[in-house]
Amino acid sequence: MTLIVTGAAGFIGSNLVKALNERGEQRIIAVDNLTRADKFKNLVDCEIDDYLDKTEFVERFRRGDFGKVRAIFHEGACSDTMETDGRYMMDNNFRYSRDVLDVCLAQNIQFLYASSAATYGGSSRFVEEREVEQPLNVYGYSKFLFDQVIRRVLPTAKSQIAGFRYFNVYGPRETHKARMASVAFHNFNQFRAEGKVKLFGEYNGYAAGEQTRDFVSVEDVVKVNLFFFDNPDKSGIFNLGSGRAQPFNDIASTVVNTLRSLNNEPALSLADQVQRGLIEYIPFPDALRGKYQCFTQADQSKLRAAGYDAPFLSVQEGVDRYVRWLFGQV
């Protein structure tokens, strides 16, 4: 049977295609928008059966042009949280998703889709409950609104619907994301270019570099998606983060030490890295005051209750692997 991956040339989508290939799956229809042509590089080492532009996909999907489809991994979206064109965002992230969902429901096709931790916005709690969801931008709202649709249709759905609220994902195949790429990616490039990593200084009661995020490796994101793919009886909306809140200092320090290791230099403590000027703290920008989340951490209770029991990579493990991969691409 055929599998479909939307956003297939993007960050998470291409990692899913590669992982499916490694399981022997090659009847994969890749759907994307290659206006940003450099994304094609993410699929060069992948095997797909066909490629479609997103503009022609939904109608052909609705007509049944692809034969028997087992599942769709719906990763296609505009993920730029700085995008201010609300009509564009809602069309890409909400309306497009609704159209794909409607076909899956009508044809009893597994529907696994990308939500986002941006649905929580200004909340200090990160649990999959309507009361704590406070999106701060139109990107977060587009994901939030689609999640509300899912909550309404879940009780009567005859096929699987599984949504994943991705936290701060990092890992291979994100180069095309440019300014929206992960902190680890930018720290890597900054250290190679300048010999140091710059982090925000003290703010809102957090010491320099100690603002925290739930950083999750794309390896774990893929594993969770595949777990639900293998368990079509499990539906719902689930947080997909490591369950740990780790400071930006951990990312920067791991990037520095991994690059030092690759240069046959010994690891240094964070204090030594700062003392040597390898990590530098800059004043917190006025433009971000009052608009910046100093803490995120996925509540994994619902994910674990669904039966996913594998451990998640820590920043030290995952970023080390990622930096070594990036170094091999240089």
UniProtKB/Swiss-Prot annotation:
Entry note about domains: Contains a large N-terminal NADP-binding domain, and a smaller C-terminal substrate-binding domain.
Keywords assigned by UniProt, alphabetized: Carbohydrate metabolism, Isomerase, NADP
Main enzyme class: isomerase
Family, similarity comment: Belongs to the NAD(P)-dependent epimerase/dehydratase family. HldD subfamily.
Record-listed substrate binding positions: 168, 179, 186, 200-203, 213, 292
Name of the protein described by the UniProt record: ADP-L-glycero-D-manno-heptose-6-epimerase
Catalysed conversion reaction: ADP-D-glycero-beta-D-manno-heptose = ADP-L-glycero-beta-D-manno-heptose
Catalytic residues (positions): 139, 177
Origin: domain of life: Bacteria
Pfam families in the cross-refs: Epimerase
Protein EC: 5.1.3.20
One GO process term, biological-process aspect: carbohydrate metabolic process
Origin species: Paraburkholderia phytofirmans (strain DSM 17436 / LMG 22146 / PsJN)
Cofactor binding summary note: Binds 1 NADP(+) per subunit.
Role according to the record: Catalyzes the interconversion between ADP-D-glycero-beta-D-manno-heptose and ADP-L-glycero-beta-D-manno-heptose via an epimerization at carbon 6 of the heptose.
Subunit structure: Homopentamer.
InterPro entries xrefs: Epimerase_deHydtase (IPR001509), Heptose_epim (IPR011912), NAD(P)-bd_dom_sf (IPR036291)
Cofactor: NADP(+)
Keyword match NADP: yes
A molecular function (GO) term: ADP-glyceromanno-heptose 6-epimerase activity
